[in-house]
Amino acid sequence: MRILIQRVRRASVSIGGTLKSAIGPGLLVFVGIEAEDGEEDIERLAGKLTRLRIFDDENGVMNLDVRQVGGEILVVSQFTLHASTRKGNRPSYIKAAPEAISRPLYERFAAGVGRALGREVATGEFGADMQVELVNDGPVTIWIDSRQRE
């Protein structure tokens, strides 16, 4: 499982011109799922995400997490996080899990993030062609892969 985290001033997801979800200051999280992913990946990344100290404290040091600043979280599925560009110029998405596997894992990930945050999170719509708008804050962008323990 891969997540791409962006600290935002605000973010929203629309589908076909209709607003689906919007948040104020917090985190926009894109999530890509592989067939081998499971509950351990969900719990590890959901917990890590909500504990990342990437918000400034009173001294301007990134020392606070999203919970401490009262931030919101928007979770959006994105299978292209598993793109392979090793061969040729057309990305391959063979590592991305099929919908039958990834949809329930995405839903469980969003629920797990909500549990770790202590409140419901905003989401995109799995499998939809979404328009995502955001205002980066910093910018702060962090990539975490559950298979790489860095």
Annotate each language-model stretch with its function.
Residues 1-92, 97-100, 104-150:
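N-terminal, polar/charged subdomain of small-to-medium soluble alpha/beta proteins
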